[in-house]
Amino acid sequence: NPHMNLNDPDTALGMLDYFNRVQYGDWPTVYGAAYTAHIADDGIETEPNGNYKTKITGKNYIKDRQLKKYVWVSDKRAYEYGKNHVQFMPKMFSNDPNVMENYAAMYGFPEFELNTAFFNNLSDPPEIRAQKRQIAEQQYNELLQKKHDGSIKISDLQRNSELLIIHPPTLAQQLNYFIDFQLGYMGFRYFMWNFSGRQNDWEGNMEVTRGNWITGIPIIDNARLGDQSKLPAKFKDNKANNKYYMLPLILGLIGFFVQLNRNVVHWWAILSLFLLTSVGVLFYTSVKPFEPRERDYALVSSFYAYAIWVGLGVQGIYLLLKYLLKNKINTKAAIAIPVICLGVPILMGFQNWDDHDRSKRRGAYALAYNYLSNLDQNAILFVYGDNDTYPLWGLQETELFRDDVKIVNYTLLGAPWNIEQVLRKTYNAEALPSKLEYKDYQLSTNDNIMVVARNIRSRFSEIQSIISSELSLSEVMSLPPNEISQHLADPGYDPMGVLEFYNEIKPFEEFYNKESMTVQEAYEFLMNNDNPAKQAIARHFGYPLGSVNFLPVDKLILPVNKENAIKHGIVSAKDADQMEDYITINISRQQLYKPELLMISMFAEYEWDRPIYFSGGGISDPGNIFWLNDYLENNGFTYKLIPIKTPFGKDGKLGRSNPEKMYENFQNLEWANYHKDNASFSNTDRNYTNTYRNIASRLAQDLIELGEHQKAKEVLDKVMEMIPDQPRYDYGLGLDRISQLYQTLGETEKAEKLINSTRDRLVEKINFYESLPLHLRYTVASELASARSDYSIMVYGQVSTLLEKSDTAEAMKVFAAEFDPVKQKFIETYQTATMNGEPDSNDKNIIDGQINFISELLGIADMIDTVYAEKQTEEIYNLLINN
């Protein structure tokens, strides 16, 4: 009875879906639509009514459990793309907004021109055509200017697609993307990791600092990636910094040519395996910029194939020496060759051991333990990604730890097989409360729930606006047609047309003024397709009930059973008077899907007799927590649903604080061996250190507000002991906040130590990034901006803490100490760059960035002394003017 049975392959259909990996979707490989089809006005063919054209690509079947056979439920459909955007080698195909922006930024923005048909419609009056032309040309010129200065985005084209003719990427652009990014960055880079060397294990998005291949030979690496000896410690002192000096690569090349020369049949076999499992896999998968994680594992078979040539390279060296020595090689030399070559795998073993040693890596275990150990009995926990799901399931499976907790991965709830699994008991965890039956969420049923509250209000407001009468809308519409015209605002309106429109929308008039439903009422409305109002809504909006459903309100009311909430420990008795009678759920989307259907069904049955938690990994999107963001209590790694309102983000905090409970939880945290220097951690593990620090700083802040200064100090000392201030854990807002809290507690020495190490690392980063030539600095532009921003945050933290104590003089002193080196560096850079006239593009890029950095810092100075800030601004301005 496992937590998840992927695709439920107990049936033939489930097995087929499992093998076809249907959860990953499909994409074109040799011929199909480019990504511009999703932004151009002619990208997808349309029907006369304006809907997108689709074509049948197959049939959807399900297993009918009553009939005990497979039955057809719907057709599989795909868009019919415009012929201008269908092409050979559509390697740039994704319609993901972020991916499309990356396509354009990296491999060329799509060409576009003004669509004159937009303003040349002869059926429009001349004045309308002139007005349209003026608007179109103005927008077009603005887009051209944006393209010229490099600030244009794909979203700009999408907003103005009606005005433009957008051209797809050229074949040259598609091939460039395939060769440079897919084969080069996502293929050759991984190959070289294994046979040349690896810079570090930070996930790379084409930056020169993260996850590149290296050789260990400075003259080669520095030319490609900048001076590696000056790389910031975060990247340089990484346990995955492995240098093989290209020795495995060279051995493999020797073996490649030896086999080609001696046994071409076997050579072809290995070459075929190598190409199919490298180039073939990359061609088929069409990886996108950028993937959620490194995809080197997809090419592992090709590495095995090349390793065969590495082994044959030893034989090649023997044969080469034998040839050079004219077959006079002796036994000792013959033995020495493999012994010497054995040094290559030994070198790799020594280089790889520290980052492959998992003996002290307890990040996943600690994360799972910390999530589960602090939850109340019989809890429901919603999680969102692989990293906050599988470790938890793993701990429940292997140790039966907290197997009373029902863990639900929210992002998988769109799949019927997954909904079915969360609606059953798992080990000692009860199923989610819900009356949903399989027929309610099966394939092609309730795939899309349209929230039409705004549309309904718009329809009735529209017809209301043409009524000019003291009578109500329904009273006017009940009159004979010849009398209706007397109550219309414009005599030109056709009373029969108005009446016909009203009669069409009249069945759902009750929802015009009805803003909300209880979740129980909403669930019943969704489940009842015989409801006349819903049938009228479906007819009006032109969608058949079945795969599409409708919700006529955008506010749901969740009643609170206060007695149960206290009885089951969701709220403590001392907080009983703060509980609300009901929770209002404000739905901000106009389309809901199966995950939201499940949530509605669950809350329709919810009696506040089980605690509900949400993982911290999902709360950034209110929809992920069903818009319950104002009713959360911070629990550290999770947030608990409580019927006490705490506005989301109040005082810069997410969720209500419960310091007493949090302090108890904090004492029992697992720390994953982060404090051990010889422990190796993955990129994901290291990123979670910020979560621990944020939890500690939030708790310490709450304790300080309660006057519990000693406890706050203990919390801060504990987190700094267990997650030391080391480059591998990097700087984050949590660390900045800890230094501020130390200052607040009077622990000046500890605060200054943190600030000094933070400053040193940020300056190290900024200096390295600015030392790179422009073409390399471009790859780390966001990291440079982030380092400067972190520096500003560090300064702001120091200044704001002192200003809270009304110590303006010390705040000014601290600011000047941080600002003056930045200012001096800018002056030196600017004077050097302009010594012989105008700065070149490389220097201009650095100068522009430094000016923005200084402006950001002077914004902080303005908090302390506006006169000082103005004086510094004027000094910088005069420097620019006089040169």
Predicted segments — roles?
Residues 1-299, 306-378, 390-883:
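ER/secretory pathway lumenal C-terminal domains and tails of membrane proteins involved
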